[in-house]
Amino acid sequence: MPRLSPFHSRTYALCRSYAWKEWAGYLAVSNYDRHSEREYFAIRGSAALLDVSPLFKYEVRGEQAAEFLAKMWTRDITRLPVGRVVYGCMLDEDGYLLDDGTVARLDEQHFRVTSSEPWMAWYQAYSRGFNVQIEDSTHRIAALALQGPSSLDILNQVVDDDLSGLRFFGARPTTSEGRPVLVTRTGYTGDLGYELWTAKQGALPLWDALVAAGADYGLEPIGLDALDVARIEAGFVLQGVDYVSARSCLTESRKSTPFDAGLGWTVKLEREGFVGREALCKKEEEGGVWGLVGLELSWPAIEAIHEEYGLPPHLGPVACRTAVPVYDRYGLQVGQVTSSTWSPTLKRSIALAQVKREWAKIGTELRVEYTVEFERRELPATVVPRPFFDPPRKTDTFGEAS
């Protein structure tokens, strides 16, 4: 039986579609209406509210908390200032990806870690010899993502401090109606946005305050389907879709390094001491095989194929997670699309794909398998820069920086 989020009484009442998914053991809304179009446009045009409580959350405390996390994550957490958040990934001893997530430094000896999967046993196994205490706070802390162009205006009406100066990937403790709330300027939409973390006892008052403040701004509660489209536009990878955790892989060929999955920017191989470094260095010295790229599919070709069948192309903002082959111009398979969608904002058909690195250069012409009426066809596709959508407001500071 799935666990219910602290916000379930609110999300359940609003979910007219009765479309739900299981997310990390929780019941989560797929889309509130029968289609996610309105929710998607709230992300890009006004403001959106998403329950992200199912994220796994860990409190790491102690004199050696920073050193411990610097060992467990690819980022040098010892250099992370108080009030800042960093994105990174965890590797196994063989240098393969286990998970990605964030680490927030709340004070000198207190960090909050988020991830897609549970890692308590993994942390405990590596914590021997470190003066740290690790708490699984997943079920104790409720979390909301407030995303979109109007998110700051709504947020400032709900919290008791002006957060206009909160920088991208900043963290600030504040209060809402006297209840403690941690606000981080983070999110999974690639837009201006914030995430709010509070004790589960304060979950419903926080939701109600945000909904009331957002009424004049077109705030919409959103589900995971709309989020999926937004994160592809932002070029963000999803664990279990764009790469598979090494812990879950049944064959070696399914495992990925950070460089294979487009997360190489989170790794500095010259930094010693993190789990998997030596093996990862060796793999890169031997020559890595894969890379993650953005693809733009030819829209005229999509129209032409559908015209043959007397069908219109589908333009709804619905993401596809079905892996399909990618070929070079000679018909040799060089990779696979992992996520794809029609982007209503960009008016382009876009995809994330894992391809062999020699075909990962911007501008490379490839072909993607495309199925219409159960018949497999091929479409021209071009390797393009990632992210596809990257508005300045995502990182702009709107007040005195903090």
Model-derived features: where do they sit?
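Acidic, proline/glycine-enriched N-terminal capping motif
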Residues: 1-91, 96, 225, 292
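Conserved, structured C-terminal
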Residues: 1-16, 20-23, 28-31, 104-402
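Well-ordered mid-protein domain cores that form the structural environment of catalytic cofactors
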Residues: 71, 75-129
